[in-house]
Curated annotation (Swiss-Prot):
Glycosylation sites per record: 212, 216, 231
Keyword DNA repair: no
Coarse class of the protein's main subcellular location: other
Database matches in InterPro entries: Papain-like_cys_pep_sf, Pept_asp_AS, Pept_cys_AS, Pept_his_AS, Peptidase_C1A, Peptidase_C1A_C, Peptidase_C1A_papain-like, Prot_inhib_I29
Gene source species: Schistosoma mansoni (Blood fluke)
One Gene Ontology biological process: proteolysis
Family per similarity comment: Belongs to the peptidase C1 family.
Disulfide bonds: 126-167, 160-200, 258-307
Reaction catalyzed: Specificity close to that of papain. As compared to cathepsin B, cathepsin L exhibits higher activity toward protein substrates, but has little activity on Z-Arg-Arg-NHMec, and no peptidyl-dipeptidase activity
MF terms (GO), sorted A to Z: cysteine-type endopeptidase activity
Protein name: Cathepsin L
Cross-referenced Pfam families: Inhibitor_I29, Peptidase_C1
EC number: 3.4.22.15
Cellular component terms per the entry's GO annotation: lysosome
Length: 319
């Protein structure tokens, strides 16, 4: 039975009606009268839920109204997350030690500043985060090899990756294997995103990039940061429960709010840093558009496996 948060002392703001109107205008939401009443009730419930997160989480993150404040937890999970991930049983190709390289990295680093990261994209109402995390990684790896930043097709993976399930979820580790079998990825412009499962329209003569293999990376976040610095961006899985209401700051939830064993979202590590308050963090690219979070990005505490962000880290390899 859901907990009534108002009984716990959380209160709706007096201008909640006005906030709802502003929310609909800002995010261009339109509902019929009956649907509007349902969404307003969900909106109010989510405001209280965001207050709960704000009080009982660590870190400097601010939680509140976002583009997804009109969705229930189940609706949000079904349309923006993916099925629960299974941690790979074999990590035989995991680099166990980077030696001196671990201590030879800067305090702050961001692949965006190197021109290695494409613009933030939007998966829409489709559980294809795994495809965006994968293409983001391949885009950066291709840039590192050739110096060319190309925007690659997520829709190709949604439609043609036989190891995954399109808008119903998937895994970057499977996607890498499928990319190799398909011979590579087409450009976004030549196979544009449509946010739904469709028939495969892959044209092998239209493939723009290739990969040779993939690698499962260490769960040690110090070594992950070193790998990112010396190599490229990293595809990771995480528990994204709190991200529904994330606005900005460094997210650092207690494990009870964000179990590392319940991974349901794929994102892309593009950098790392340390805040003025000495909080180590990851810079993470999401696939929910630029109106969410910090212009489509968020920062997650680095060092204690918050939300399982270090649990399943992978990358394509291009020789």
């Amino acid at each position: 039975m859901p907990v009534n948060l108002e009984y716990l002392g959380f209160k709706l703001p007096g201008n909640v009606d006005e906030k709802y109107v502003q929310f609909k205008l800002k995010y261009r939401k339109q509902y019929h009268e009956t649907e509007d009443e349902i969404r307003f009730n969900i909106f109010k419930s989510n405001i209280l839920k965001a207050q709960l997160y704000q009080v009982f989480v660590r870190g400097s993150a601010i939680y509140g109204v976002t583009p997804y404040s009109d969705l229930t937890t189940d609706e949000f999970a079904r349309t923006h997350l993916t099925a629960s991930w299974v941690v790979p049983s074999s990590r035989s190709n995991t680099p166990t030690s980077l030696g001196k390289e671990v201590n030879n990295i800067p305090k702050n680093f961001d692949w965006r500043e190197k021109g290695a990261v494409t613009e933030v994209k939007n998966q829409g109402m489709c559980g294809s985060c795994w495809a965006f995390s994968t293409t983001g990684n391949v885009e950066s790896q291709w840039f590192r090899k050739t110096g060319k930043l190309l925007s690659l097709s997520e829709q190709q993976l949604v439609d043609c990756d036989g190891l995954d399930d399109g808008c119903n979820g998937g895994l970057p580790s499977n996607a890498y294997e499928s990319i190799i079998k398909m011979g590579g990825l087409m450009l976004e412009d030549n196979y544009p995103y449509d946010a739904k499962n469709e028939k495969c329209h892959l044209k092998t003569d239209g493939v723009a990039v290739y990969i040779n293999s993939s690698v499962n990376l260490t769960q040690d976040e110090t070594e992950l940061a070193a790998w990112l610095y010396h190599n490229s961006t990293i595809s990771v899985g995480m528990n994204a429960l709190l991200l529904q209401f994330y606005q900005h700051g460094i997210s650092h939830p207690w494990w009870i709010f964000c179990s590392k064993y319940l991974l349901d979202h794929a994102v892309l590590l593009v950098g790392y840093g340390v805040s003025e308050k000495n909080e180590p963090f990851w810079i993470v690219k999401n696939s929910w558009g630029v109106e969410w979070g910090e212009n489509g990005y968020f920062r997650m505490y680095r060092g204690d496996g918050s939300c399982g962000i270090n649990t399943v880290a992978t990358s394509a390899m291009i020789y």
